[in-house]
Amino acid sequence: MEMKRCISSLTLEQLTAELKEMGQPGFRAKQLFHWVHQKLVTDFSAMTDQPKALLARLEEAFYIAAPIIERRQEAKDGTVKYLLRMADGNCIETVVMRYHYGNTVCVSTQVGCRMGCRFCASTQAGRVRNLEAGEICSEIYTAQKDIGERISHIVLMGIGEPLDNFDEVMRFLENISSPEGVNIGMRNISLSTCGLVPKIDQLAGKKLQLTLSVSLHAPNNDIRSGMMPVNDAYPVEVLMQAVRRYQETTGRRVSFEYSMVRGVNDSDACAKQLADLIRGMGAHVNLIPINPVDGSPYSATDAANVRRFQQKLESLGVNATVRRRLGSEISAACGQLRRDEMNGKV
C-alpha cells in the first residue's frame, strides 16, 4: 500500500500540478492551499467548498500535518514551549516568544541533529530524520491556534540545522511567506546555521530577504573546533569568506550568535579576536548565556562577565546585545524537553 504524502508540504505550484493530474481545474489548488495554509484546517472534511469525490481521493493519497501537543509549558512572561508529537511518533520542540512587536515562533527543522555541537542538548542523540516542509509549517499553525493570536515572526533556531535540510526548508519558506497562506514576510524570518559553507552559498543564490544568523560561538579555530565539530570541515576563515559572499550577493546584513561559556570563549582576548573578525561588516552579535545541558562540561558565563564582554565589543566598534532570557522558569536548553521525553522523564 502506498504511503500517504503530506499535502501541507506541497507548494502552490506543486499542488496545482497534482490536481491537474487528477483532472481538476486550476482554481482548486488555490482553494486547497487556502484551507491548509490560511484557514489552518487539519481535516479534509472541513473543506466545505470542495467536491466530495475530490476530498475522498485526497484523503486516500494525502494527510495534513497536525502534530499533537504532548506537553505545554508556559512562563509568566507568556513564553510557551511545546513538545509536539508528529504523525510517526517522533517528538520535536517549538517555542512561542512574545515581544512588543508581535509573536515569534522558534521552529525545529529536524528530529534531532547530527552537527554534534558540544553545548547543545538537541544533538546528543543524533539526527533521526528531516522534517518535511508541511511539518515545519504545522509547528507555526499549531502554536497560532493554541495561543489564539497571529504569529508575525519566525526564527529557524530550534532542533536541527536548517541548511542540513535545505530543500524542505526552502519549500517551507515558500509556503509560509505565500500571500495565499499566513503570509509571514521574509524580512520577519531569521534562519540560523552552524556554518555549512556550501549551503550558505546555495542560500545566497536564492537571494531571499530573510536574515541569516550564523552560530559562531568562538573567534578562532582552536576554541570553535573544541565546541563545534563542523569547524573541522569549515574553519572560521572559510566560514567568514562565505558570510561575506552571502552579504555581497544578497545585500542583506547577517547576525552572529555567540553562546557565552565560562572560561572557554568569554575572555577579553576572545572579544578582541571576535571584533577583528567581523568589524566593518555591519553585523550584529547576539550574546547568549548558555543553558546547562546534562552531560556537558560547559557552564554559563555569569551576568557581570557577559556585560563586560559586550562592553569590550562595543568599545571595539561591534554592535552587540545580550539576548533577553524569555521564560526563564521554562528555559531548559533547546532539545532538553525532547531528550527528557526520550529518557522517560516527561
Describe each model-derived feature in a short phrase.
Residues 1-92, 244-253, 258-346:
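Auxiliary Fe-S-binding modules of radical SAM enzymes
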Residues 88-102:
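P-loop NTP-binding catalytic core
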Residues 74-75, 108-109, 122, 192, ...:
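Short linear Ser/Thr-Pro motifs
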Residues 144-320:
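Conserved AdoMet/S-adenosylmethionine-binding subsite of the radical SAM
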Residues 98-135:
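Canonical Radical SAM [4Fe-4S] cluster-binding loop centered on the CxxxCxxC motif
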Residues 80, 92, 103-107, 115, ...:
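Generic beta-strand structural signal
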Residues 124-153:
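Conserved alpha-helical substructure of the radical SAM core
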